[in-house]
Amino acid sequence: GLMNQMGYAAGTIGNHEFDFGLENMARLFKSLNFPIVCANYEFSEYDLQNIVKPYVILHHQGLKIGVFGLAPELKGLVDQRNYGNTVYLDPVATAQKMADLLRKQKCDLVICVSHLGWHEGGKGDHEVISHTRGSDLVLGGHSHTYFQTLRYSNNLDGKPIPVDQNGKSGIYIGKMTLQFDKK
């Protein structure tokens, strides 16, 4: 579909992917030309454990880029019949685990693709960043927030981490050019 035509390198799961159940979600994900990453859900149904990966490592212009995904707690957000036995893991602990793992794999850049929302009851992007270290950028969604410019949250080391959110429903499409010194 359209997302394949847009050339995504990776995507994550949002709560609305569950609207028509796990079997439908698996069918949709199988049709994609890019990986779906989500590190804080564990699946046991419809081959989703083989389709959804916690992270992916991309190679671009000589850089090794680790991308992991985070998604919101489903209980109270999605009808339980639509998410079945999906297990939700704490996004803060999971983000730290993923950043550590990707740094050990010598990634030059670690990106979190998040559907947690900006400030969402203690488990949004801001809170995850402020309680972890090792991620370089968060590309967020869920709260339908539109940032005209990047926002920053300090990580555990006091380093400002950029966060971008582009609203909802594809009204805005973000484009970001990163420039940094490879050490």
Tell me the role of every PLM-derived stretch.
Residues 1-183:
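Acidic, metal/ion-coordinating pockets
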